[in-house]
Each structure stands twice: as structure tokens, then as C-alpha cells.
């Protein structure tokens, strides 16, 4: 069940233990609801929980029934008990250990956290120190509940040095919980005090408020007696307000607004006041809404000072903003300026300029609404430490009968009487701003000036006539306006005669609107001018109103433009950047063109220009007062061109002047011939920092004896303006950055750091991999060294005797202690099916060839020589065919073998000695046998050589003279190959010689291809070397064998399986 306003009878429905709660919400105790933060009631049977959406972390309020977490869990009520306090009822949520805890307990015990700050669950209790569970609640002791005093965890009094401990819910029932302004982005801290310190804090707060309000008025002319008189008059005002509400359900355009409005104070807290700005009551406040802070006006006209004082004894002050979410760290309103003075309301009845009853609601730091809209709630971000100033429409006819002739500088809230004088609201970022139909709200400016009396009703009738002519109505219906969320911040200029003027930033997050400068100004001759911009579906207009000696001329914005266009203002002095004042409806601006009213005294003008996108019915305006002929005193406000509007030094008014050509004359000249000429500097209008707003700057005079005196400019150069903009932009961002956002940014930063580290590691690994591959590529790209053969026949020839066709399993499972030093590890001789099928009768046997390097060879020579032998590992010889016409040689270049051979001691093969002399014999000491039984090897005499036909040598003798030594050696070896192939009676020794010489020829394919041998002794070398290209790097593919097919009567075949797979695996 959702309610935007709490029914009065709800307290009767609350269970007995919760009846002591002061408000409706079980978390914040506020009994009010808002459209964006409604009060939601649990529909569970017998459950009386009522919470705000933001207080309980409800992401979306359902349209149907809603159940609290306790009712939703359907757990027995006896089992649901808060782990932090002895109370069972209230708004409970699950904890991380499966128990339950109150949301309010989680908020007020500092160590308790929410795992998810948006849903506010689960409640994490693991950080709560044990000491809190050992404390006893003094409230339970006082009320005779000693058995429950030690239950749960207790919070302590926030007064330094006080050791009183109490349960959060006990303090909530007793009204001892409050909120204090935090430092920095932590805008609100949740505090609780014991009864003694809470009462002391309340008293000191009351006194500090009183002193601060007096400091806003003329401190030299007030006495305490007048203070009490004005308080009494204020109560009379309230009664008249009640009658006024009954008489006026609808605002009327003919209403005469009185310039002086009573500002009703409940709690005025300002951040300039160290004590008064701190205490905020939790029970009646609404400071925990995350999305926006909603300005809300009391729904009853009786909520005046008497009510607030009666409630003040119980510690129930009203606060002017709605709930910020109850999250830790995001508890405050979404952007409060802690450093701006916002409270300008006073407990005094304000003087009226006219004796005619008028109804104006002027807000200085709070938003007030029209009578018919009084029960709905405005949504303004005025969270700048101000409690609700409920401005009641005043009928101030008999206020100052006895003081009509006196000049008393009281704190006046002047409304910038534009349009309907019913609502004067200050908006900054309204999410839902409810204005009644026909309202044109105008924000007001708390100023200190003389109260003027004895103004005749004729003047008021003139004001009525001017109002009817010059002002347009805003026709937004109740509910949210169509305007942008980012609307104008209206800067309030508080001017007092003896105290420094504080330009009050009325909007949270409006850093551009507050800048404290000395301006000891008073209203001269009681004249006040207020320039405001109204935005309505019909159009926008700026209305300037003067109260000067009984005349109330009204100047519209077009007159201002015409005056600027006609040269009344210096083009250098009037810097206007006002691209579009017309509201979002798009209709043209019906502004009237007239002359600038002539005033005998210079006036400070300030224009609050509404955002083009803000079609809200509320008119931000800043009424400014005339400086009291003090040359050199200036009112400065921060530049409002932070987010979109810029300081334009050239008058770019062509568009607006074109719009104002068709406007009408609205008024006559004033009394005197002094024009509103612009010299010196002027306050810049405070515009919204979030919308592309226009910035209108008007310069003004400080006249003395009808002569112009130039006021020194606030910023002498554009550099100073930019520097101020930069610093204030930083301040704005700091103030806008709520702790939840900072927490989210820190989490994102942490995630980015983790991801960055992971990517750096990945890059490091990939770089190392790339370097390894580059090294391997460099090793493999080294050309094979030339194989030098020993021509001397003085070597003993060792040859293997061929093993006669051992079965494949004996080949694959042969275990020899010497195999570890060879290229043939166990199980590394697979027999390919295609070779078995292609040569059906061929049998396979393997020869393990390993030639240790000579003793005198250095390791460098060993490693360099190894690369030439890589192909030994992959050469496989099949059956020799009888015809030998189809000799296909695929001797693979095995990659990555050289690195293994160089790295493994004992596996280093030397090139020297592999290929013998020209007779083709192989010299190699037999060190490794494939079978456990040693192989029988025969010694061939060194001079033993295969016979070479002389015809072959003579046939090729003619080509030998043209060849180099290396080519000659290869040629002779080729001749030997042909001799061997022609004989077709190969012994196992010849098989070995043939194998090695084929391997040697593969190292030099280009030279072999260039050999052109005459005669029939030539062998198809290209066929022998087909498929001898090197495989790609780091890929171990099974290479095809050098298969030489024979018929069924062919000789026994020696066949060596491919080793590239195991070798590459060992390399990787």
C-alpha cells in the first residue's frame, strides 16, 4: 500500500510496541510522503510497518500489495528478532549471517554496513566490535527492562566524553536520534544523544538561531521588546493566513502582493552557524532520499512557531528536504552547499509597504506553494541546512500601525512580484515541482531595508493594473512540470545594513550562486527593484518592478533590450549571453518594449535567466537592492557560466531585439531623468550549473550627486573569472559527489587496476613468448654449414649389420640404456599404415645413428655443427625399387631439433665424420645399439671402396672442371648413388651410405639443381629432393618418408620412422 501522505489515523493501527514512534516511517519517523519517495505500508496480516521507499531500499514500488521482508519471508514472528536491539517490530532486513536487523539500527551503528547500498540489504554485521554487544542500554534500565538492557549492540552518545549507551530503537522511541551535518561529501551523519546532552543541544541551537537571525537584520536598531512584539504580530498573521486560505482556493491575477512577507520559522539552520547548522531531527526529517531532495511545505497552516515550539520540547524540528536514501555514506541530500547561508527568515512580522492585504509567499531557502496546491509538495533541492520556512500568505494591513513612520531595518523577504503573487519558490533541481494552474512563482530575495509605510491604496491599484498588463500566467497543472530536471538555481541576495551580505545559494549544488562580498547597502528611499524571468508555456518575460515614492512602474525585458540596443548601456559594460529565454513551448515572447524607468537612485540589477529547457512555471528571480551610495562596495555573485553559459564580452542581443520589435509599450517613465546607465560591475545572475542557460550581465551605477562613480569591477580580467570558475567548479564537484558515487568510482578504479595488472601480465607473457619464437626463428634461419668430408682413406669403417625385420612391437618397446642419448626415445618409431599398405611385403627396421663429437671439438662447434644433422632424425628409407625411375625424396627439415641437440649433453651429433671419403663409406663409432644384444659390425679396410664404373667418371669428366670443390664432391657422390642403384644388390652398409649421402645432398638443393651432368649417368635429383621444404615453426607434423618402392622380390628394407613429433614435443 502506497501513500503520498500519512493518514492521521495510522497511529491507531500501529502495534503497541511501535506506538511510541514519533512519525510514520519506521526508519526515519517522518509521517509525510512524496510522489518520488512515497510512504509504503506493508500489507501483511497484522503488520504495521510503514517505510519510505528510499528508507527501506525499495527499488520499485509495486502497484499491488507490498510486503516487508519479514512478511515476505513468512517466518514465524517469534523467530524474527533484531540482532542489534531487543525490539521485534519495525522495518527489518536480513543480515549476512541469516538473522534479522532493523534498518534504523544499521544506520545508526557506525560499523554496520549494507552489502548493497541501493537495496539496503543484506545488513553486514561482521565489522561490529564485540564491545558494542557488551554495553547495556541505560534507557532500558530506566524503564525497568533490565533483562533486555544487555541485548544486542548499543550505540553511544555522540557527545564527546559521554559514555551513555543505548539501543538505537530505544533512542528512536525517546526522540533522541538526529542527523548532523557531516564534513566534506559525507553530508549527513546519523547521531544519537543521551537525554541530557540532547536537551542541552536543543537549547544551544535555539539560542544560536535567534542570534543569527538578528545578525541578518540591522543590528543597531533592534531591541528585545520589539522582537517580542513582532512575534505576537506574527501569530496574528497566522490566523489571518488561515482565513486567507479559506477565502482563496484559487489565485487571482488581481491580487496585490505585499512586498513584505512573514517568514515562519520552525528550525532555521545555517551552515554559517556552527551549532545551529548541525542538529537535525531524524524523526520529522526526510534527509535520506538518493535521487533528489524534495522540498516540502507543511500541509497545515497551523504548523507555525507555536506548534514547532511545542514540538521542539520533544525534539521534533521540521526539516525542509525529503529522504535521501538510508544508505551509509549516501545519506545526505544529493548536493548541499554546507557553506552557504540560506536562512534569512526571522521571527519578526515583516513590514508591509502597502496597507492593502496581499498574499505573497516568499521563500528564502525553502519552497512555498500556493493555497490550493498547499497539500502537495514541491520538489526543490534546497538542502542547504535550512529547516522548513513555511511562508504563509500574509495580510499585513495592520502590522505596522505604530511603526508606520519609523525606519527600521528589519529582515524583509521581498517577493519579486511577477505574475501571480501566490507562490515564491526557489528551485534548483526539482524532480517533481507541483505548481497550481495559473501560478507564476517568483523567487524572492531576503533583504534588509527600510520598511515603508503610508502607501496609499491608489498605488496598489496601479500595481494591479501593471500586473494585469505585464505579467503572464504559467499554466502547468499540478504534478510534475514538463521542464527539465536541471532548472535554474535562484540566487538569493541577503543584504543587511551593517553586516556583510551573503549571496545565498538557494540550491544545493549551486556553487555559482554564492559569494560573500561586503555590501553595506540599504534601501535608499525605500526603493527596491526586482528583476525576474518568468518561463511559461506562453513565453518568457522579465519584469522589473520598482517601488519608488508611491509609483510602481513595471519594466519588461524588452525595454531592457531596447535600452541596451539604444546605447543607454555601454556595449562594453553590458555583457549579455542570452540566447534563448523563451520556454520549451517554443512560442514567441510577448515582451513589451518601453523605456528604462528613471530612478533618482542607482539600482543594483540582477537577472536570473531561466533555462531554455526549463519550462517550469516557477520564475527564478533575484531582487536586488540599491547600494547605499558607498562607492567601492559591490555585490558579487559567482559566475553562472559553468555548464553551458559563457561570459560573452560582446553584446549578442540581435535575436532578442528582433523578438522585442513587436512588443508593446507597457509603462511610462519614472519621476526623474536618471537612466539606468551601466558602469562598473554587477552581480552575475546565478543560473543553473547543469543546463545550457543564458547569462545576462547588467552593470549598474553608484551615483553620487548625479555624477557617475565607477564601481571597481569584481574581476579585473577574464583570467580571474576563469580562475574563480575553476575553483568553484571544483567545489561544486566536491559537493555534488556523494559518498555513494565516490564509492562506486573507487570500486571502478579498483576493477580497472586489477584488469590493468592482468593485461600487463598477459602482455609480459606474450612478449616472452614472442622473444622465444624470434630466437627460434633466428636459429632456424641460419643456413646449414658446408659439410667437409675427409678424403683420406685412412679411416676404419664401421657399419651396422642390418637387423632382419624385427616386429613393430620390438621396435617400439626396445629398452636400451643408450637410447636416452640418441634421437630415438622409447615408443618413438610408429609404423604408418600408408607405408605398410603401399609396400606390403616391406619390413621395417630402424637404425639408431649417433655420432659423438670428437674430443677436441669445442661446445660452440658442436652446437653449430648440429644443425646440419637435423635431417637424420626424419629420414626414412623404404624399399628400393628395381627400376628406380620414381625416386621421391621427402627429407623433412625438422625444426627445433638443433636447439634440443645443443641443449642436451650427450645428444650432440657432429657433422665431422658422418659422411666419409669419396668412396661413400660411413665412419662412425658404434655407441648405441637398438636392441639389448650388441650389433655385429664388420671392419672394412680403409681403402675399401665401392667400385665406380670408369664410364661414369669419364662421362662426367668434362663437367668436373667447371665445378667447385664442393660441387665436385656432390657430383661424385651422385655418381656413387647411381652406381649403387644400378647394381641393385645393396648390402646394409650401402643402405647406410645411401641414406647419409641423400641427407647431405638435401642440404644443398640449389647446387644440385644447377648441376648439369652430361650423358646417361644423370639421376633425377629434383625427384629425390621433392618435398624437402622446411615445415613452419613450432609445428610438429608427421613428415612423409622417403619411400623407394620395389617389387615383391626386392631386398630387405631399412626404414626409419619419423621423429619430428616426439622431438618437437620435447622442445616445447
Swiss-Prot record:
Location of the region described as Leucine-zipper in the Swiss-Prot/TrEMBL record: 752-780
One Pfam family linked to the record: PHD_2
Coiled coil as UniProt keyword: no
Keywords of this entry: Isopeptide bond, Metal-binding, Nucleus, Phosphoprotein, Repeat, Ubl conjugation, Zinc, Zinc-finger
GO biological process, one term: positive regulation of transcription by RNA polymerase II
A single cellular component GO annotation: nucleoplasm
The protein's assembly and partners: Self-associates. Interacts with FSTL3; the interaction enhances MLLT10 in vitro transcriptional activity and self-association. Interacts with YEATS4. Interacts with SS18. Interacts with DOT1L. Interacts with histone H3; interaction is necessary for MLLT10 binding to nucleosomes; interaction is inhibited by histone H3 'Lys-27' methylations (H3K27me1, H3K27me2 and H3K27me3) amd acetylation; interaction stabilizes association of MLLT10 at chromatin; interaction is essential for histone H3 'Lys-79' dimethylation (H3K79me2).
Protein name (Swiss-Prot/TrEMBL): Protein AF-10
Organism of provenance: Mus musculus (Mouse)
Amino acid at each position: 500500500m502506497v501513500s503520498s501522505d500519512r493518514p492521521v489515523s495510522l497511529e491507531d493501527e500501529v502495534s503497541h510496541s511501535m506506538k511510541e514512534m514519533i512519525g510514520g516511517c519506521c526508519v526515519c519517523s517522518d509521517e509525510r510522503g512524496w510522489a518520488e519517495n512515497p510512504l509504503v505500508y506493508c500489507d501483511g496480516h497484522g503488520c504495521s510497518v510503514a517505510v519510505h521507499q528510499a528508507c527501506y531500499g525499495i527499488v520499485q514500488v509495486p502497484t499491488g500489495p507490498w510486503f516487508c521482508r519479514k512478511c515476505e519471508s513468512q517466518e514465524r514472528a517469534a523467530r524474527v528478532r533484531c540482532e542489534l536491539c531487543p525490539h521485534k517490530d519495525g522495518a527489518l532486513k536480513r543480515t549476512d549471517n541469516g538473522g534479522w536487523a532493523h534498518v534504523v539500527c544499521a544506520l545508526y551503528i557506525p560499523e554496520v554496513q549494507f552489502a548493497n547500498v541501493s537495496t539496503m540489504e543484506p545488513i553486514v554485521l561482521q565489522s561490529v566490535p564485540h564491545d558494542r554487544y557488551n554495553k547495556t542500554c541505560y534507557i532500558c534500565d530506566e524503564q525497568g527492562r533490565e533483562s533486555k538492557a544487555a541485548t544486542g549492540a548499543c550505540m553511544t552518545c555522540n557527545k564527546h566524553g559521554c559514555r551513555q549507551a543505548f539501543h538505537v530503537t530505544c533512542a528512536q522511541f525517546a526522540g533522541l536520534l538526529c542527523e548532523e551535518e557531516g564534513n566534506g561529501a559525507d553530508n549527513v551523519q546519523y547521531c544519537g544523544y543521551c537525554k541530557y546532552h540532547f536537551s542541552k543541544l536543543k537549547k544551544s541551537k535555539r539560542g544560536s538561531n535567534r542570534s543569527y537571525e538578528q545578525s541578518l537584520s540591522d543590528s543597531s536598531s533592534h531591541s528585545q521588546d520589539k522582537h517580542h512584539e513582532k512575534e505576537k504580530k506574527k501569530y496574528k498573521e497566522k490566523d489571518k493566513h488561515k482565513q486567507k486560505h479559506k477565502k482563496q482556493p484559487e489565485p487571482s491575477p488581481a491580487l496585490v502582493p505585499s512586498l513584505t512577507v512573514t517568514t515562519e520559522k520552525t528550525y532555521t539552520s545555517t551552515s554559517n552557524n556552527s551549532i545551529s547548522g548541525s542538529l537535525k531531527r531524524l524523526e520529522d526529517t526526510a534527509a535520506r532520499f538518493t535521487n533528489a531532495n524534495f522540498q516540502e511545505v507543511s500541509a497545515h497552516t497551523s504548523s507555525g512557531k507555536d506548534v514547532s515550539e511545542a514540538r521542539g520540547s520533544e525534539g521534533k524540528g521540521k526539516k525542509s528536504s525529503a529522504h535521501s536514501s538510508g544508505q551509509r555514506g549516501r545519506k545526505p541530500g544529493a548536493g548541499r552547499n554546507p557553506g552557504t547561508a540560506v536562512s534569512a527568515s526571522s521571527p519578526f512580522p515583516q513590514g508591509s509597504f502597502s496597507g492593502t492585504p496581499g498574499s505573497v509567499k516568499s521563500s528564502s531557502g525553502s519552497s512555498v506553494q500556493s493555497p490550493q496546491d498547499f497539500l502537495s509538495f514541491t520538489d526543490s533541492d534546497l538542502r542547504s541546512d535550512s529547516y522548513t520556512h513555511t511562508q504563509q500568505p500574509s495580510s499585513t494591513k495592520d502590522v505596522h500601525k505604530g511603526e508606520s513612520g519609523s525606519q527600521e531595518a528589519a529582515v524583509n523577504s521581498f517577493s519579486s512580484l511577477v505574475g501571480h503573487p501566490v507562490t515564491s519558490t526557489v528551485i534548483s533541481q526539482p524532480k517533481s515541482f507541483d505548481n497550481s494552474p495559473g501560478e507564476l512563482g517568483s523567487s524572492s530575495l531576503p533583504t534588509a531595508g527600510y520598511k515603508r509605510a503610508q502607501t496609499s491604496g491608489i498605488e496598489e491599484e496601479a500595481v494591479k493594473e501593471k500586473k494585469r498588463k505585464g505579467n503572464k500566467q504559467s499554466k502547468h497543472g499540478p504534478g510534475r512540470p514538463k521542464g527539465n530536471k536541471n532548472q535554474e538555481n535562484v540566487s538569493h541576495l541577503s543584504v543587511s545594513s551593517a553586516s556583510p551580505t551573503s549571496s545565498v545559494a538557494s540550491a544545493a549544488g549551486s556553487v555559482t550562486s554564492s559569494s560573500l562580498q561586503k555590501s553595506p547597502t540599504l534601501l535608499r528611499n525605500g526603493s527596491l527593484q526586482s528583476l525576474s524571468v518568468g518561463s511559461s508555456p506562453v513565453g518568457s518575460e522579465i519584469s522589473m518592478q520598482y517601488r519608488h515614492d508611491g509609483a510602481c512602474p513595471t519594466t519588461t525585458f524588452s525595454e531592457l533590450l531596447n535600452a541596451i540596443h539604444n546605447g543607454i548601456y555601454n556595449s562594453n559594460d553590458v555583457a549579455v549571453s542570452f540566447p534563448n529565454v523563451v520556454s520549451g513551448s517554443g512560442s514567441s515572447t510577448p515582451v513589451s518594449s518601453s523605456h528604462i524607468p528613471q530612478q533618482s537612485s542607482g539600482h543594483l540589477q540582477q537577472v536570473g535567466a531561466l533555462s531554455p529547457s526549463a519550462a517550469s512555471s516557477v520564475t527564478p528571480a533575484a531582487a536586488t537592492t540599491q547600494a547605499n551610495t558607498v562607492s567601492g562596495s559591490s555585490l558579487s555573485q559567482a559566475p553562472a557560466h559553468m555548464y553551458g553559459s559563457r561570459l560573452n564580452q560582446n553584446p549578442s542581443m540581435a535575436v532578442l531585439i528582433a523578438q522585442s520589435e513587436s512588443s508593446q509599450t507597457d509603462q511610462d517613465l519614472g519621476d526623474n531623468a536618471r537612466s539606468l546607465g551601466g558602469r562598473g560591475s554587477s552581480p552575475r545572475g546565478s543560473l543553473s550549473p547543469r543546463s545550457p542557460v543564458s547569462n545576462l550581465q547588467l552593470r549598474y551605477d553608484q551615483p553620487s550627486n548625479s555624477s557617475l562613480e565607477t564601481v571597481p569591477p569584481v574581476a579585473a580580467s577574464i583570467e580571474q573569472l576563469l580562475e574563480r570558475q575553476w575553483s568553484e567548479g571544483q567545489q561544486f564537484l566536491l559537493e555534488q559527489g556523494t559518498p555513494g558515487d565516490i564509492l562506486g568510482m573507487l570500486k571502478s578504479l579498483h576493477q580497472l587496476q586489477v584488469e590493468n595488472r592482468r593485461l600487463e601480465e598477459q602482455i609480459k607473457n606474450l612478449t616472452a613468448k614472442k622473444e622465444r619464437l624470434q630466437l627460434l626463428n633466428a636459429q632456424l634461419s641460419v643456413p646449414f654449414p658446408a659439410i667437409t668430408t675427409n678424403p683420406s682413406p685412412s679411416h676404419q669403417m664401421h657399419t651396422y649389420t642390418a637387423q632382419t625385420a624385427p616386429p613393430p612391437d620390438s621396435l617400439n618397446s626396445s629398452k636400451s640404456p643408450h637410447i636416452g642419448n640418441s634421437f630415438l626415445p622409447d615408443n618413438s618409431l610408429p609404423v604408418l599404415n600408408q607405408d605398410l599398405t603401399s609396400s606390403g611385403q616391406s619390413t621395417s627396421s630402424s637404425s639408431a645413428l649417433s655420432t659423438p663429437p670428437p674430443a677436441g671439438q669445442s661446445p660452440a662447434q658442436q652446437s653449430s655443427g648440429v644443425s646440419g644433422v637435423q635431417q637424420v632424425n626424419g629420414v626414412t628409407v623404404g624399399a628400393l625399387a628395381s627400376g628406380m625411375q620414381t625416386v621421391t625424396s621427402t627429407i623433412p627439415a625438422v625444426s627445433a631439433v638443433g636447439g634440443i641437440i645443443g641443449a642436451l649433453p650427450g645428444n650432440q651429433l657432429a657433422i665431422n665424420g658422418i659422411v666419409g671419403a669419396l668412396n661413400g663409406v660411413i665412419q662412425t663409432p658404434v655407441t648405441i645399439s637398438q636392441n639389448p644384444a650388441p650389433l655385429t659390425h664388420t671392419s672394412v679396410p680403409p681403402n675399401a671402396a665401392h667400385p665406380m664404373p670408369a664410364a661414369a667418371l669419364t662421362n662426367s669428366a668434362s663437367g668436373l672442371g667447371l665445378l667447385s670443390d664442393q660441387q665436385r664432391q656432390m657430383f661424385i657422390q651422385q655418381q656413387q648413388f647411381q652406381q649403387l642403384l644400378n647394381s641393385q644388390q645393396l648390402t646394409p652398409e650401402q643402405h647406410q651410405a645411401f641414406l647419409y649421402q641423400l641427407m647431405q645432398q638435401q642440404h644443398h638443393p640449389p647446387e644440385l639443381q644447377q648441376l648439369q651432368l652430361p650423358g646417361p649417368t644423370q639421376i633425377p635429383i629434383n625427384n629425390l629432393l621433392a618435398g624437402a621444404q622446411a615445415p613452419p615453426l613450432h609445428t610438429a607434423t608427421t613428415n612423409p618418408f622417403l619411400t623407394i618402392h620395389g617389387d615383391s622380390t626386392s631386398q630387405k628394407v631399412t626404414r626409419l620412422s619419423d621423429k619430428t613429433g616426439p622431438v618437437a614435443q620435447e622442445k616445447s
